[in-house]
């Protein structure tokens, strides 16, 4: 799963934030600077599939209804992440 790989890499780089937008390259915030995490775009459909797998059906249902979700996710042995997910358009 690309999302878990990005989360792991963020921790390795001592980053504080992971910025994801569908059909765009992902970005890390490291020591206050926004840096590209990859040169490869994270397709919207792949991002949604990864979020569905990561969060599970109940949280995804809340996201679909409210168009936003604040939650946390623990990546075993790596870190706990606070997540703010929202739709910017539509």
Residue ranges and their predicted role:
Residues 1-90:
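N-terminal "pre-motor" subdomain/linker immediately upstream of P-loop NTPase catalytic cores
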């Amino acid at each position: 799963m690309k999302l878990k790989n990005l989360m792991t890499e963020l921790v390795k780089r001592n980053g504080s934030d992971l910025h994801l937008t569908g059909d765009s390259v992902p970005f890390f915030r490291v020591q206050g600077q926004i840096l590209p995490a990859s040169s490869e775009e994270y397709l919207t459909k792949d991002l949604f599939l990864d979020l569905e797998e990561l969060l599970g059906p109940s949280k995804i249902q809340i996201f679909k209804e409210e168009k936003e979700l604040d939650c946390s996710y623990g990546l075993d042995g790596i870190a706990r992440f606070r997540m703010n997910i929202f739709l910017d358009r539509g």
